[in-house]
């Protein structure tokens, strides 16, 4: 490894030779980042991306002004899926260094897991990786159950089984119980439900190549809620939380589900499949039924669910949906504290009725008459949350993954949302 390039911070503008808008300058001692007080964390992240683009793979964050948030902003921009990078961190107090180390361990796990090729990360591997991460931070305070294949059908998990049966890799439900109280009768404070589609071809409603080439990332919701629980534990979470990951491939085969199929769920709802590429909501429904059965104060589901959310928000914000205004406000406050981007989109009672079917209670996708795709998807999920008007948040993870690099991010997963959900759990 080469000698480290020193990176320092300054509140003074760059020398005029670098231009009036320069955010960094190069000198004999290394590189100086010039903070202007407007968006210092964003400036640091963008500068780190540029430094990586120069081919500098070994840096030392040096001098005054560095704290955990600024170090983390640098790493968010500096990290990329290819190559090895080394950062020598500045001296931080014990609490800040622990916070930074926990972010590096857990949020990097989220990014690396989402970036993993689908060939090496199937449903079973995703579930086991989640167990390993949570067990690493929680020890014996965790128990779990993995249900897969035909056992899912026999136990009534018909959405997950239906979507996943077309793959040679069995669908999997992970039910994990973090119980720091040690009391088996302790109430469940929160349930987290994640969409874990480890590859999404679209099924018989097959995607075009341009929309399929990033579908290894369709398990981003599952990775995000797993990381959020792990991170909340490192921040002292002392309440019982259950995690449900609904993991499957959505592939084409002679055994794959078809348009016109009808799925009957354990809560009695019948759903007609009119688009096999709207599979995420079908698997999440099973997890939400289980979550509701725990009678928690809070249910949060996270999923890379709709293209409509990305159309509205790009990859810059996660989309938030809820009937509970106070709870949505708490989540947005947590996002502001953690400097993570969330934006609330509409969800009203009428969205629940915009999925009509001639053969079942619900259709799994909206029609031309009801084009608000992200809102109708959230409305669909609400049919599987027992008390959907209170205590439920749906996150459509539009900021989880970038197909191409931008000025502040490399291509690939971002890890955004982990800290916000953890903040809400520990508030």
UniProtKB/Swiss-Prot annotation:
Localization per Swiss-Prot or TrEMBL: Cytoplasm
Disulfide bonds: none
Record InterPro entries: Leucine_aapep/pepB, M17_PepB-like_N, Pept_M17_PepB, Peptidase_M17_C
Domain of life according to the entry: Bacteria
Cofactor note: Binds 2 manganese ions per subunit.
Swiss-Prot/TrEMBL catalytic activity: Release of an N-terminal amino acid, Xaa, from a peptide or arylamide. Xaa is preferably Glu or Asp but may be other amino acids, including Leu, Met, His, Cys and Gln
Keywords: Aminopeptidase, Cytoplasm, Hydrolase, Manganese, Metal-binding, Protease
Pfam entry (one): DUF3663
Residues given in the record as Mn(2+) 2 binding sites: 195, 200, 218, 279
A GO CC term assigned to this protein in UniProt: cytoplasm
Binding positions for Mn(2+) 1 per the UniProt entry: 200, 277, 279
Entry's Gene Ontology BP terms: proteolysis
Classification via SUPFAM superfamilies: Zn-dependent exopeptidases
Gene Ontology terms, MF aspect: manganese ion binding; metalloaminopeptidase activity
Keyword Protease attached: yes
Cofactor: Mn(2+)
Catalytic site positions: 207, 281
Listed EC numbers: 3.4.11.23
NCBIfam families noted in UniProt: PRK05015.1 (NF003450)
Record's subunit section: Homohexamer.
Family annotation (HAMAP family): Aminopeptidase_M17
Free-text function comment from the UniProt entry: Probably plays an important role in intracellular peptide degradation.
Family: Belongs to the peptidase M17 family.
Protein name: Peptidase B
Species of origin: Escherichia coli O1:K1 / APEC
